[in-house]
């Protein structure tokens, strides 16, 4: 998983993002790694809002600004994402290098949004107004997951739990219908347009 905060500080010296927290927010030795990472991510996002032109307050932040932040982080990614016209598109282990861009892995972005949602609520934000839980962000993450899965030749589907054989024989011999796939959203397609073309801020 990509170390977003560390990469940001190492590769963008012109933007002074502080990963150090004030003494009042210093974590005790027993604080978990998750809490430390969540604090760093929150500080990075708040600094991003302050460096925005014009600067943004947290109250005025929307899902669109969160998407801009995620695209901005792509420049610090370490995951090779092949274009559709690349000869290695869909190959999990390419035999040679290619000029396709490095991006943030879907798993990193998904975990990041989860931490930012939690931090937003811990800092007084209401869950129903959280920009990190907006529909546009959910669509974007789903599109990134699907495209990276095809591009890298990997599967992000969760493994289904094995069902006990006794339960199968005792239950009625009928198969459940497949879940209907959610139709493609035009909004999701427009949000992924910049992603496919490697646009970053």
Swiss-Prot record:
Residues 15-32 have a biased composition (Low complexity). A motif (Nuclear localization signal) lies at residues 158-162. Residues 33-160 form the ALOG domain. The keyword Transcription applies. It comes from the Eukaryota. Keywords: Developmental protein, DNA-binding, Nucleus, Transcription, Transcription regulation. Pfam families: ALOG_dom. It is found in: Nucleus. Residues 1-14 have a biased composition (Polar residues). The keyword DNA-binding applies. Residues 1-37, 151-201 are annotated as: Disordered. GO terms for biological process: mRNA transcription; post-embryonic plant morphogenesis. Belongs to the plant homeotic and developmental regulators ALOG protein family. Probable transcription regulator that acts as a developmental regulator by promoting cell growth in response to light. This is Protein LIGHT-DEPENDENT SHORT HYPOCOTYLS 2. It comes from Arabidopsis thaliana. The gene is LSH2.
């Amino acid at each position: 998983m990509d170390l977003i905060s560390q990469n940001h500080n190492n590769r963008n010296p012109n933007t002074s993002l502080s990963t150090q927290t004030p003494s009042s927010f210093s974590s005790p030795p027993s604080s978990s790694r998750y809490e430390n990472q969540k604090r760093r991510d929150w500080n990075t996002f708040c600094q991003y809002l302050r460096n925005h032109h014009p600067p943004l307050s947290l109250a005025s932040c929307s899902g669109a600004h969160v998407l801009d932040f995620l695209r901005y982080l792509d420049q610090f990614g370490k995951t090779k994402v092949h274009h559709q016209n690349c000869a290695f598109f869909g190959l999990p282990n390419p035999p040679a290098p290619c000029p396709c861009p490095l991006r943030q892995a879907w798993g990193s972005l998904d975990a990041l949004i989860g931490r930012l949602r939690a931090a937003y609520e811990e800092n007084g934000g209401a869950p129903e107004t959280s920009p990190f839980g907006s529909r546009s962000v959910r669509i974007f993450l789903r599109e990134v997951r699907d495209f990276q899965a095809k591009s890298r030749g990997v599967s992000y589907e969760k493994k289904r739990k094995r069902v006990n054989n006794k339960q199968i024989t005792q239950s009625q011999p009928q198969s459940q219908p497949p879940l209907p796939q959610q139709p493609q959203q035009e909004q999701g397609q427009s949000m992924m347009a910049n992603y496919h073309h490697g646009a970053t801020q």
